[in-house]
Structures are given as structure tokens and as C-alpha cells.
Amino acid sequence: MSTPMSTAAFDLTGRVALVTGSSRSIGRSLADGLAAAGATVVLNGVDRARLDATRADFAARHGEKRVHAAAFDVTAEDQVVAAVAAIEAEVGPIDVLVNNAGVQHRVPMLDLELADWRRVVDVDLTSAFIVGRAVARGMVERRRGKIVNIGSVQSELARATIAPYTSAKGGLRNLTRAMAAEWGAANVQANSIAPGYIHTEMTQNLVDDEDFNAWVLGRTPAARWGSCADLVGPTIWLASDASDYVNGQTIFVDGGMTAVV
């Protein structure tokens, strides 16, 4: 006999959540949402000044003890391993990992430099493997953990001039499945959120481009850009006990873009 699920299943009180690339934009909003749901959050970035400013803002609203900052390069395995060890020793075991760090590089493929291809793939795909594996070692041992990889509509679609990005995000979708396949038996759930076109300070130039803005509004059934707030609820769900039987999935939060032609 089934019983109704309590909203307590979404409560993250006592959980430690590491969110990569969280000093600004989408990552910052996701970390803020997890903290609002009760989690102790560890912010990450490589710009120490911006990271400290974000931590100070969060601490003022969520409490000093529930907000921490770890500056490390998600593509450097030695830094990642050291940072994860320090977080687990000083803050506590990592219960939730959000692999959000990402970069974009727009150029036609015939003009794309190999170094730029490698940089985008390293940040957008390889970092999720490096950080995910480092954190999952503890999760598997404890037999409990949640990994949320931030993909994109480009996990499913392609668009001209962003070949390394769409390749990396497509790879991230299958990396998510691989994590579920290998770690699911240890009660680790790995899922992906695939945002559509989200209005942030990092996409403001696209919003300001009249032709591109018209394309987004016309291509999206919701007829609007998404907001960071649209991604918070799904992230809390995938980080919580409410999603314990969800594994290896990609949730598209795109206003219906990938549902239509």
C-alpha cells in the first residue's frame, strides 16, 4: 500500500552540497536554492574575490556555519582531490554534488582552434568526471549520495558555431548514465538537468541581440527566456530523498523547446 509523500522528503537540512562554478549566474542560484532548502553549501570558483563576495552574501542570509567556499580548478585533478578531502574533513561528508561549472566558445567549426575545443570539453565534460569521481568515492563507501550534472538543451540538440559545447553537453548526458550504471547499486543517484535558454548576466548579450532573442522566443513554446529560478526546484528535487528512485535521467527545463519542431 502506497502512502502520500511528505514535503519533508524535499528537506535538505543536515546535507552538505558542493556546487561547482557557483560564484555567479546559474550555479549561484542553485547553491542559494539548496541553502534555502536547508543544505550546508560549499561554493566553488576560481575567482577568489567573487567567490568570497558570494559567500559573504550567502552567510548573511543563511548563516556563517552553513556557507563555505573552496577555490579550485575543476579541471585539475590534484586540486580537486585535495579540495574534496579538505571539505569532507572540515565541513562534512559531501551528500550532494552539483556539477555546474561550464564555459562557452562561439566560432564556426572550420575556424575553431584545437586549444579552444579542448578548453570547452575539459570544463564542460571532463570536470564532471574528475569532480564526480572524487566525490563519488566517499558516496559509494557511505552508500548514499546525489549527483546533479547541469547539461543543456544542447545535450539533445545542436546549433551552429558551438560544436565543442554541444559535444561536451551531449557527452555529459551519457556520463550521467554511466554514473548511474556504475554507482546506482551503492545507492548513489546521478541525474542531469538540461536548461533551455536562461537569461543571466552571461547571456545578456544574446538577449540584447534582436534576431537571436526573436529566435528564442519563437522557438520556445513558453515564449520566454528561462530564469535561474526555473532550475532551482528540479535541483532541490534531484538532491533530495524525493528522487531516490530516479537515476541516470536528464530532465529538460527548457520551456518545451526540445518537445517541438
What spans do the regions from the language model cover?
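Residue(s) in the substrate-gating loop at a strand-loop-helix junction
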Residues: 152
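Short C-terminal tail/terminal secondary-structure segment
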Residues: 2-8, 157, 235-236, 247-261
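Alpha-helical segment proximal to the catalytic Tyr-Lys
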Residues: 137, 181-185, 244
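Active-site helix of classical SDR
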Residues: 132, 168, 176
